Amino acid sequence: MPLTTKPLSLKINAALFDVDGTIIISQPAIAAFWRDFGKDKPYFDAEHVIHISHGWRTYDAIAKFAPDFADEEYVNKLEGEIPEKYGEHSIEVPGAVKLCNALNALPKEKWAVATSGTRDMAKKWFDILKIKRPEYFITANDVKQGKPHPEPYLKGRNGLGFPINEQDPSKSKVVVFEDAPAGIAAGKAAGCKIVGIATTFDLDFLKEKGCDIIVKNHESIRVGEYNAETDEVELIFDDYLYAKDDLLKW
């Protein structure tokens, strides 16, 4: 049975965040990029790529659908230009800036970013939103395998000092904030609980993909106290669309 308790409090060791669709609604900007990219390529179905590739690294999408252009330096340049060329289409996911600022205000680093975007693009999104970047800011340039492979989220949790603890999972409680199937799969494979953000896909889809708790956006989430003894920080969900009942036992 799903939970109905509100507010819901979770004590966690670390939080990992996707960027596109999770912190910033950049999908319209990225869609505009793909349409421009495909204008002189008759074989390239931009609408199909837009539909299927959310959460992928741009390099992986180009390697699959336009392999002649799969050059890392070229792709990095293209993606790095997206915020300047198409940034007017992008806005904060409601509540994201406030939530990130609250995490930044904690006495210890408790959050990281793991995005499929390139470092240049992701840094520019943070600059646009005026969010201080966390120490562990993992991008497409920092991994050999992108989402849905767990490498990005494993790097994030390991960097923060909370690798998977199979003997005692309660000593390494990490949540992933995600909006896309590839990222949800990556987070689950990295041993994390998933906070689904219903910006890109609807409630039923996110439930089907296995999210543990689903929210409309970040406005209903607060950062509570940090406990130095347990090295846990409290996340308080004043409202949510769905939550699994096993969260109470986590």
Swiss-Prot record:
<feature type="cross-link" description="Glycyl lysine isopeptide (Lys-Gly) (interchain with G-Cter in ubiquitin); alternate">
    <location>
        <position position="64"/>
    </location>
</feature>
<comment type="subunit">
    <text>Monomer.</text>
</comment>
<keyword id="KW-0963">Cytoplasm</keyword>
<dbReference type="Pfam" id="PF00702">
    <property type="entry name" value="Hydrolase"/>
</dbReference>
<comment type="similarity">
    <text>Belongs to the HAD-like hydrolase superfamily. DOG/GPP family.</text>
</comment>
<dbReference type="GO" id="GO:0046872">
    <property type="term" value="F:metal ion binding"/>
</dbReference>
<keyword id="KW-1017">Isopeptide bond</keyword>
<dbReference type="GO" id="GO:0005634">
    <property type="term" value="C:nucleus"/>
</dbReference>
<dbReference type="InterPro" id="IPR051806">
    <property type="entry name" value="HAD-like_SPP"/>
</dbReference>
<feature type="active site" description="Nucleophile">
    <location>
        <position position="18"/>
    </location>
</feature>
<keyword id="KW-0539">Nucleus</keyword>
<feature type="binding site">
    <location>
        <position position="18"/>
    </location>
    <ligand>
        <name>Mg(2+)</name>
    </ligand>
</feature>
<dbReference type="GO" id="GO:0000121">
    <property type="term" value="F:glycerol-1-phosphatase activity"/>
</dbReference>
<comment type="function">
    <text>Major isoform of glycerol-1-phosphate phosphohydrolase involved in glycerol biosynthesis. Plays a role in osmoadaptation and required for adaptation to anaerobic conditions.</text>
</comment>
<dbReference type="GO" id="GO:0043136">
    <property type="term" value="F:glycerol-3-phosphatase activity"/>
</dbReference>
<dbReference type="InterPro" id="IPR023198">
    <property type="entry name" value="PGP-like_dom2"/>
</dbReference>
<keyword id="KW-0832">Ubl conjugation</keyword>
<feature type="binding site">
    <location>
        <position position="20"/>
    </location>
    <ligand>
        <name>Mg(2+)</name>
    </ligand>
</feature>
<dbReference type="InterPro" id="IPR006439">
    <property type="entry name" value="HAD-SF_hydro_IA"/>
</dbReference>
<keyword id="KW-0479">Metal-binding</keyword>
<dbReference type="InterPro" id="IPR036412">
    <property type="entry name" value="HAD-like_sf"/>
</dbReference>
<feature type="active site" description="Proton donor">
    <location>
        <position position="20"/>
    </location>
</feature>
<protein>
    <recommendedName>
        <fullName>Glycerol-1-phosphate phosphohydrolase 1</fullName>
        <ecNumber>3.1.3.21</ecNumber>
    </recommendedName>
</protein>
<feature type="binding site">
    <location>
        <position position="179"/>
    </location>
    <ligand>
        <name>Mg(2+)</name>
    </ligand>
</feature>
<dbReference type="InterPro" id="IPR023214">
    <property type="entry name" value="HAD_sf"/>
</dbReference>
<dbReference type="GO" id="GO:0006970">
    <property type="term" value="P:response to osmotic stress"/>
</dbReference>
<keyword id="KW-0460">Magnesium</keyword>
<feature type="cross-link" description="Glycyl lysine isopeptide (Lys-Gly) (interchain with G-Cter in ubiquitin)">
    <location>
        <position position="144"/>
    </location>
</feature>
<feature type="cross-link" description="Glycyl lysine isopeptide (Lys-Gly) (interchain with G-Cter in SUMO); alternate">
    <location>
        <position position="64"/>
    </location>
</feature>
<dbReference type="GO" id="GO:0005737">
    <property type="term" value="C:cytoplasm"/>
</dbReference>
<feature type="modified residue" description="Phosphoserine">
    <location>
        <position position="90"/>
    </location>
</feature>
<keyword id="KW-0378">Hydrolase</keyword>
<dbReference type="GO" id="GO:0006114">
    <property type="term" value="P:glycerol biosynthetic process"/>
</dbReference>
<keyword id="KW-0597">Phosphoprotein</keyword>
